[in-house]
């Protein structure tokens, strides 16, 4: 279920301040954030945001087609290493 249109998209205030400061700065650097719940706005395009996945910060370069999605969608929290090998083959 999506967010109500009358509320509008959500972005953490501290992240928005960092993005605005970064767009005004001449030298761009990586913005670290723990806010996986924030929606990507159009003024985030072209910035690199390091999103925390519970273990480390994953750098996410924001592109045009990411607008409207959440930051957490681009930093997976679980690492899939495949299923365990079938022991039946090795016993024969």
From Swiss-Prot:
GO process terms (BP): ribosomal small subunit assembly; translation
Signal peptide: none
InterPro entries linked to this entry: Ribosomal_uS19, Ribosomal_uS19_bac-type, Ribosomal_uS19_CS, Ribosomal_uS19_SF
Superkingdom in the source lineage: Bacteria
Record Gene3D superfamilies: 30s Ribosomal Protein S19, Chain A
Keywords in alphabetical order: Ribonucleoprotein, Ribosomal protein, RNA-binding, rRNA-binding
GO MF terms held by the record: rRNA binding; structural constituent of ribosome
Single GO cellular component term: small ribosomal subunit
HAMAP family membership: Ribosomal_uS19
Family per similarity comment: Belongs to the universal ribosomal protein uS19 family.
Described function: Protein S19 forms a complex with S13 that binds strongly to the 16S ribosomal RNA.
Protein name as it appears in the record: Small ribosomal subunit protein uS19
Organism: Lactococcus lactis subsp. cremoris (strain MG1363)
Gene name as annotated: rpsS
């Amino acid at each position: 279920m999506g967010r109500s249109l009358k509320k509008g998209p959500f972005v953490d205030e501290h992240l928005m301040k960092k993005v605005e400061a970064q767009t005004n700065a001449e030298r761009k650097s990586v913005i670290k954030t723990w806010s996986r719940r924030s929606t990507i706005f159009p003024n985030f395009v072209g910035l690199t945001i390091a999103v925390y996945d519970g273990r480390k910060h994953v750098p996410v370069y924001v592109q045009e087609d990411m607008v409207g999605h959440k930051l957490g969608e681009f930093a997976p929290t679980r690492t899939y290493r495949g299923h365990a090998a079938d022991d039946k083959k090795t016993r024969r």
